[in-house]
Curated annotation (Swiss-Prot):
Main location: cytoplasm
Entry-linked InterPro entries: Cytidylyl_trans, KdsB, Nucleotide-diphossugar_trans
EC category: transferase
Species name: Xanthomonas axonopodis pv. citri (strain 306)
Role according to the record: Activates KDO (a required 8-carbon sugar) for incorporation into bacterial lipopolysaccharide in Gram-negative bacteria.
One GO term of the biological process aspect: CMP-keto-3-deoxy-D-manno-octulosonic acid biosynthetic process
Pathway(s) annotated for this protein in UniProt: Nucleotide-sugar biosynthesis; CMP-3-deoxy-D-manno-octulosonate biosynthesis; CMP-3-deoxy-D-manno-octulosonate from 3-deoxy-D-manno-octulosonate and CTP: step 1/1; Bacterial outer membrane biogenesis; lipopolysaccharide biosynthesis
UniProt-recorded name of the protein: 3-deoxy-manno-octulosonate cytidylyltransferase
Amino acid sequence: MTPTTPADFVVAIPARYASTRLPGKPLQLIGDRPMIQHVAERALLAGAREVWVATDDARIVAAIEHLPGVHVAMTGTAHLSGTDRLAECARIAGWDDQACVVNLQGDEPFAPAAGIRAVADLLQRSGAQMATLAAPVDNAHDLFDPNVVKLVRTAGGDALYFSRAPIPWHRDSFASQHDSVPAEGQWLRHIGIYAYRAGFLQRFAAMPPGMLERTESLEQLRVMEAGYRIAVAVTPEPFPPGIDTADDLVRAQMRVASA
């Protein structure tokens, strides 16, 4: 078992301007600040040793380059995923292979600091190649929504599988109804925050996508199909949903306005 002292970690935030569902998403205002600034401030609040934003757009650079404690990596335009972009960011930043890198999505302006620290601590504590978080599914809509990724894990906390399907499948309950969460069993939804060592991040980005990833369109399945461990912990406090659509943005703006 690895040491239990709080992890020393860096945070890398992939930020892409050309979002399909919400163009210019990182620069959309929430209150008086762009979304990407909120995310970077959450990372700083969590106690990250360094915070980097990885982007290929000069408009995003201009919006955050003035922020104290936040670095910007101008990355290439051909990356197919956030993992590829973060791998380039890690090379630009010059992180040692053993550095703990937390991948915090650029559309998580309300990510709790405790959750960011928790995923870094989990990586250190578990000895797994990757770490991530989950939260209980408490409603049938999320359970059967393919946009809400579900997961199952071992008794020791390692991921067994991630899926857009409602796993585990409750043979008796699901055969007759899809409008409630069965009382027996536990269903978990994935929270898309990751931690890995910088060296493993490079290895991950270099792996070809496997059949499972191509089928489910879930990048983390590449790691599992290659035989590596992903440790999963239930988040220590609620993780508000990220922002994917214009409706999500309106709700976020209302949340800040009412605070």
